[in-house]
């Protein structure tokens, strides 16, 4: 008996590819560091000003350390998918207490501090940035300019860390392998080639420069505002305490009267800010571009060189880690679109432990798409009612009750309206006062007396009614207060506003992360394999599942369309400010269009064989409506392309 072929895990092929991409991003950081080191060179010697083993190389190594911190941070925190939450304040509450938040802020602050030390060491002596200055009689004085520059760069690092967390820079925007206009364009490997990614990085350089300049100006304004208000006295005392044992400094810790905000100082701070911001932005851009290359190697799928390519691919598709599963699904979509040999291998792979390869791929893709429906059901499901505890009699037995049983009314039920309660009390009090006399109520009243009593009571109630018409509850009061003073403001109400875009992403893509490319590639892969089976499935195993595939895609497409486009997701009461782009979610729209396009491909290819697939005319008509097709195709009586399985 032949030995079973070892199935290598999918990560054995993905990890080397990712490591090569990490190395390429590191080279970009090194080139950026060497370029900035050249900018700070004094060019007093034609050799040592640029030679890597001289002072320039030492500065480049330290600058490289500042950039590599960002790469290490990205490696430890990268994730596919967008963060899904109903409001920004919900995102803040969920992610702010985590260790990764402190790690991000500390990484950028440490990188900025190291950069400030290197930059101060390269500033010319006549710039006035030495730590100790000497005036008359050789008396040493502490210079505030380097203190402000270092503080500014550290604050800029914290500011960049906050922007990093707010913009979710750690997210990887994975691609898709959808056919364009129904045609399958062959994958040549250019999307995953290093030269293509470097060309894209080069095209991003002007944007990186503009972004660095803009953020540097914002950071300088922030530092100039916070430094004298919060940090100046403390930092001055700390520096005086540390340097007084080394220099003959004054005993007083009072800072100078003038702030170090001269034009030359601010220009130096701005130049240093642009350099360090450029290093950070270049590192982040290179990492984001290079890591999301297509799962191809030399124009072939990553698992092409495996001993068991289908088994390794299945291992990735079944992996519980979202990043590995997304890359494996992306590779499957490429196979369904561009690689007929691998498609035939999937159709002909029958002797697997858990069933044929096609059956497992079909189930995995449909389970992935069913997640969308499950997410919608979970989001729209009403909260479970609170369970009432059993009565004490069931546990202690029947005993004689000595008091009235407890009330079972809802304790949080609203009180009767002020209007009805007031009217009832006034009416009863007025009638009792009228009927009561010195000797008690009379036995009866005359008709005239009754009419007079009724008219007086009505006039009194009408006069008191305007004061008791409006019912005010605490919830309605605070809601009106929030709508009037907080949510109506575009800036103040932003953290609490639950926009339709955010709620759509949470409802459809799930939480805490939702990766649209996973669902797009799943729909593209299963539909592409089904359509290709007409020519490449020699045994006709795929056609057994075509009818159920059409029904599942029809049901899912109808549910998504009803929820997203037909009012299934209403407008939240906090969404009171009309902002452009907040009404639609691009990621959800991409998923909806992918499901619709997959259904269109399958129904166009298999509608002529609907009778043999046991699809009714109603099912075909419904599928065409969901897919957006109009004209019907005549059903063929003879189907030589298909193999009927009885």
From Swiss-Prot:
The lineage of its organism: Eukaryota, Fungi, Dikarya, Ascomycota, Pezizomycotina. One of its GO terms (cellular component) is spindle pole body. InterPro entries: Nucleoporin_prot_Ndc1/Nup. Residues 42-52, 125-144, 229-271 are perinuclear space. PANTHER family: NUCLEOPORIN NDC1. It holds the Pfam family Ndc1_Nup. Residues 542-602 form a coiled coil. Keywords: Coiled coil, Membrane, mRNA transport, Nuclear pore complex, Nucleus, Protein transport, Translocation, Transmembrane, Transmembrane helix, Transport. The chain crosses the membrane at residues 21-41, 53-73, 104-124, 145-165, 208-228, 272-292. It is a multi-pass membrane protein. GO terms for biological process: mRNA transport; nuclear pore organization; protein transport; spindle pole body localization. Belongs to the NDC1 family. The gene is NDC1. It is found in: Nucleus, Nuclear pore complex; Nucleus membrane. This is Nucleoporin NDC1. Component of the nuclear pore complex (NPC). NPC constitutes the exclusive means of nucleocytoplasmic transport. NPCs allow the passive diffusion of ions and small molecules and the active, nuclear transport receptor-mediated bidirectional transport of macromolecules such as proteins, RNAs, ribonucleoparticles (RNPs), and ribosomal subunits across the nuclear envelope. Due to its 8-fold rotational symmetry, all subunits are present with 8 copies or multiples thereof. Residues 1-20, 74-103, 166-207, 293-646 are cytoplasmic. Functions as a component of the nuclear pore complex (NPC) and the spindle pole body (SPB), probably by playing a key role in de novo assembly and insertion of both structures in the nuclear envelope. NPC components, collectively referred to as nucleoporins (NUPs), can play the role of both NPC structural components and of docking or interaction partners for transiently associated nuclear transport factors. Residues 380-407 are annotated as: Disordered.
């Amino acid at each position: 008996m032949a030995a079973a072929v070892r199935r290598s895990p999918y990560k054995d092929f993905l990890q080397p590819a990712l490591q090569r991409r990490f190395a390429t991003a590191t080279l970009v950081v090194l080139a950026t560091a060497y370029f900035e080191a050249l900018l700070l060179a004094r060019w007093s010697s034609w050799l040592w000003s640029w030679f890597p083993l001289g002072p320039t190389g030492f500065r480049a190594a330290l600058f490289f350390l500042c950039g590599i911190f960002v790469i290490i941070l990205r490696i430890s925190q990268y994730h596919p998918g967008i963060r899904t939450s109903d409001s920004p304040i919900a995102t803040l509450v969920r992610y702010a207490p985590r260790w990764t938040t402190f790690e991000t802020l500390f990484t950028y602050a440490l990188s900025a501090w190291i950069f400030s030390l290197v930059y101060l060491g390269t500033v010319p002596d006549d710039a006035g940035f030495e730590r100790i200055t000497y005036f008359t009689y050789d008396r040493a004085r502490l210079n505030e300019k380097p203190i402000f520059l270092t503080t500014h760069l550290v604050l800029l690092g914290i500011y960049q860390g906050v922007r990093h967390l707010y913009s979710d820079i750690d997210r990887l925007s994975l691609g898709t392998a959808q056919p364009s206009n129904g045609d399958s364009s062959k994958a040549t490997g250019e999307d995953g080639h290093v030269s293509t990614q470097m060309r894209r990085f080069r095209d991003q350089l002007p944007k990186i420069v503009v972004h660095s300049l803009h953020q540097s100006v914002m950071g300088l304004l922030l530092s100039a505002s916070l430094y004298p208000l919060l940090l100046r006295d403390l930092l001055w005392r700390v520096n005086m305490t540390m340097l007084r044992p080394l220099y003959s400094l004054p005993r007083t810790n009072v800072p100078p009267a003038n702030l170090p905000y001269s034009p030359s100082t601010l220009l130096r701070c701005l130049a240093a800010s642009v350099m360090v911001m450029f290093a950070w932005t270049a590192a982040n851009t290179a990492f984001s571009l290079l890591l999301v290359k297509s799962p191809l190697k030399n124009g072939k799928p990553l698992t092409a060189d495996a001993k068991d390519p289908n088994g390794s691919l299945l291992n990735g598709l079944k992996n519980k880690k979202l990043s590995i599963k997304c890359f494996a699904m992306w590779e499957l979509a490429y196979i369904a679109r561009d690689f007929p040999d691998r498609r035939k291998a999937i159709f002909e792979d029958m002797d697997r432990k858990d069933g044929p390869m096609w059956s497992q791929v079909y189930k995995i893709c449909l389970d992935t798409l069913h997640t969308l429906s499950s997410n919608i059901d979970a989001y729209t499901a009403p909260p479970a009612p609170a369970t009432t505890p059993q009565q004490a009699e069931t546990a202690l037995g029947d005993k004689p009750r000595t008091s009235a049983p407890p009330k079972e009314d809802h304790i949080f039920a609203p009180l009767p309206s002020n209007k009805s309660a007031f009217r009832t009390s006034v009416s009863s009090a007025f009638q009792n006062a009228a009927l009561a006399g010195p000797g008690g109520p009379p036995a009866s009243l005359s008709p005239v007396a009754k009419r007079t009593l009724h008219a007086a009571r009505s006039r009194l109630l009408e006069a008191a009614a305007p004061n008791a018409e409006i019912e005010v509850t605490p919830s309605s009061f605070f809601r009106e207060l929030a709508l009037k003073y907080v949510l109506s403001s575009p800036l103040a109400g932003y953290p609490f506003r639950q926009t339709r875009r955010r709620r759509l992403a949470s409802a459809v893509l799930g939480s805490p992360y939702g990766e649209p490319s996973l669902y797009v590639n799943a729909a593209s892969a299963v539909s592409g394999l089904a359509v290709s089976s007409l020519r490449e499935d020699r045994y006709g195993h795929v056609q057994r599942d075509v009818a159920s595939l059409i029904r599942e895609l029809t049901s899912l497409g109808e549910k998504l369309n009803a929820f997203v486009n037909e009012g299934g997701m209403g407008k939240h009461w906090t969404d009171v400010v009309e902002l452009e782009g907040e009404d639609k979610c691009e990621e959800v729209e991409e998923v909806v269009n992918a499901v619709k396009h997959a259904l269109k491909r399958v129904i166009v290819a298999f509608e002529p064989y609907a009778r043999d697939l046991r699809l009714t005319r109603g099912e075909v008509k419904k599928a065409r409506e969901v897919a957006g097709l109009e004209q019907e195709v005549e059903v063929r009586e003879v189907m030589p392309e298909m193999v009927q399985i009885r």
